[in-house]
Amino acid sequence: MRKSKIAITLGLVVGIVLSAFAFLFGYTRYLLSLPTYDTEGTIPIETNLEQLPDVEPEMKEGMKIPVYNNPQIHNILLIGSDRRDDKSYGRSDSMILLSINEKTDKFHLTSFQRTIWVSIPKDTDPRYQRYWSPNNALNAAHTWGGPRLLLKTIQRNFRLDVQHYVKVDFKNFVKVIDRVGGVEIELTEAEASHLRGQGHQVTAGKQLLKGDACLAYSRIRRIDSDWKRMGRQRTVIEALIKKMRSMSPLSLPRVLEDIMRNLETNLTPGQLQSYIFNVLKYRKYEIDQMFVPIEQHKARTKTKSGHEVYKINWVKNIEAIRAFIEQ
């Protein structure tokens, strides 16, 4: 009789465990069905760059550096697009390289200033071929050829082998922030005043901002600079990560669904699944950040058309990025 009870108990435990695994497997498959997948394939390493025409001397020096790849560091370009219609790629207002360092248990966030003067491959969408020029601001690459051309441009100029991207439209990001109940942002008086002018009831200091207020906050530029705007966009991302870390694991599924539903990526479902399974581990990772170009190795200038751009010391910036993501 005793053996029979033990067998029944073990059977129940095994049944519960198997049911849990079946649920998790099914739920993960559901999550993986939500994003929009780009299946164009890998991006080859460019060669013979010394033969490129119209490359400025400072750029050529940077291009002599071999493309960097470290198997212990997973690089994913996070693209925040401010798309005004469904047919265009939109402007890549936010370009942040997420480097997951499995050796040091850290997330490194490298924000690229969108008006860095770069060399752009002639691999545009046919619709925008007439707008292409060999040198332009970094975010022009996304406008002319979407995420793939942006990845190629980053490889060529920053000497980084970044094969993967995750893209979200800022307007859709509002839903995710609302799902977590808003995020806490510390506002300056100037920022608060600007947001009040757009109808948001906020004051200076720490504020709990809902999605639409976060979107307005991340777009602020007129009160200071595009550089500060980059910082605000990253502040929102960090605040969201912090909020998700503090949430109960039982609350995360709905948030993950909203995030996945609003993603476009060239990661495969299998690769995404691997990152999802590591969510609990990643919650313990430290986060650090840097801006590119670095302050002492950039120069603000204007193009012939009057647009303000940054020309940079490529060798110094490339070295700084590598040192940062290896920490």
Stretches with model-predicted labels:
Residues 2-327:
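Non-catalytic, solvent-exposed segments at the cell envelope interface
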